[in-house]
Amino acid sequence: MKSEIKNAQFLVDGKPFRILSGEIHYFRVPREYWRDRLEKLKACGLNTVATYIPWNLHERTKGTFDFSGGLDLCSFLETADELGLKVILRPGPYICAEWEFGGFPAWLLAEPGLRLRCSEPKYLSYVKRYLEAVYNEVRKFFTRNIILLQIENGYASYGNDMVYYEFLKKLADESGYQNVLIAADGDSDIRITTEVPDGVWRVLMCGFSNPVPQLELYRKRQPDYPQLIIEYWDGWFAATGETFKMRDQHGIVEHLAKALEHGAHVNLYMFHGGTNFGFMNGALRSGNHYRQMTTSYDYAAPLTESGDVTELYRKFRELFAKYNPEFSAETPIPSDLPKASYGDVRLDEFAELSENLDVLSVHPQTSVYPLTMEEAGGDFGFMRYSAQLPAQSIPIPVTITRFQDCGFAYLNGKYLADFNQPEATFTIPANQSGTLDIIIENMGRTDFLCNLEDNRKGISGGVILNHQRFHFNWTSAPLPMEDLSKIKYGALPEFPVQKRPGFFRGRFQVETPMDTFLMIPGGSYGFCRINGRLLGRYNKSGPYYSLYVPATFLKKGENTVEVFEQDYLARPMVRFADHPNPDMKSFSTLE
């Protein structure tokens, strides 16, 4: 299989090929559901699937690569090939995607002098190792179904280092890949006029208006190339605490129709959004304003977070039937997977965080100043900082300088205060001595804009006592919250439990595992686990009030649900429903 561009036409094996693509991120979808989502993509009239590749999952530990289980990229590509789908591969190294740190591994931030997305030598050495590992993994698909390979992502929105850009192209050229290379950018003047390496097809990201004028600007910039919208935004992401606003879906369909009438190739971003399982949500920051992405990455896409067909899917399918000669409008649409309501589950066990800090701490290190999460070898979750304080005859104010993102403090295991960025100040009562524990949560690293390097989590400044001096000599330890097996659960305390961050556990029976949706009606803010697998964060401020639980997380018989509540749990129960809250299908404006 050979892809190429001749006379401003995209060819596959010497014949014109119209790219009608949809984006699905394999790492946001349970492996067991890859085929279901890809079959629905093909049944929508599409002939290609696009995916990013997250460096921070495949090389979470420096020098150790993982392409197994849910990260088995080759299995995803194989499934696509079996279904006759072409592939657009987008390996980064930066992916944005509302994903934690834009896909970069956190350990890059612990490297002295390293600078991101430029020709800084140390950064280039790590990029080379990562991309060579990816290319070695997928090489057999270079001649089977990978028709486009992206070498950078929105680089004109970040920098203009052509040495770096040429380095990425050279890595791709030397990998054995001989098909078309692309570079994705937005539509502003400064982005369009930024250079890309020779021989690289510049492709467009857009979706909020008629894309034809932007496509024409790209045509003028590269007259010998066709036009591809690599990200046609058919929905949008959601940030915690913000009101969800559904975009005008009539306009989305209408603008896509104009692009197709204009002759453009398209990739729907997203075709199926999926879920930011675990602590993998990204964030945005402007000054002191921090926006945390939600666990759900539903995106108001043609397929819902749980893979259900929407009215938008059906409208897109009608449209693509006009432009895909190999697709029949009579093709059946695969059925949605069954959902179950398992009802209310009582949380009848409790473990206070302060009493379990030692068993949750990983590789504690002592130092004069507190270590950042990255310096301490952590990446996701929380950080613990411990120090001994002498008693003082007066109350002592404590100020934490330069920290991310939020946290709370204990004195001798007793809850003292909570705080949020950008400032943290609390008071040690008079005549109190002992162990001060400060817990800082990484709520998600930013994934976009020029502040990517300002993503060091935990404490990057210091702790000042009485507004006068730093307190030195700290023990710093990551709390990844991945292994809770050593937590000591006990009986549920008398309710209400206020300002006692801790773990609640309950058990429930399942006869037939099916997809379901977990709700925490009395919860404030925290995260949930099912049978030891981390689902993700929840927040009473919305806009999503449920967590998607794939059937693959459940088992026949007894199941366990654990809730870590950081603030206040009003009721010791959770609920499993057969629909999400909100139900995104009910937002459709096309019915």
Feature map (PLM): residue ranges:
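Aromatic-lined substrate-binding rim segments of carbohydrate-active enzymes
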Residues: 35-100, 169-174
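N-terminal carbohydrate-binding accessory modules
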Residues: 1-48, 78
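An active-site-proximal structural segment forming one wall of the substrate-binding cleft
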Residues: 72-89, 112-146
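Catalytic-core region of carbohydrate-active enzymes that cleave or remodel glycosidic bonds
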Residues: 174-175, 205-304, 308-311, 319
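The substrate-binding groove and active-site-proximal loops of carbohydrate-active enzymes
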Residues: 19-31, 55-72, 109-129, 150-161, ...
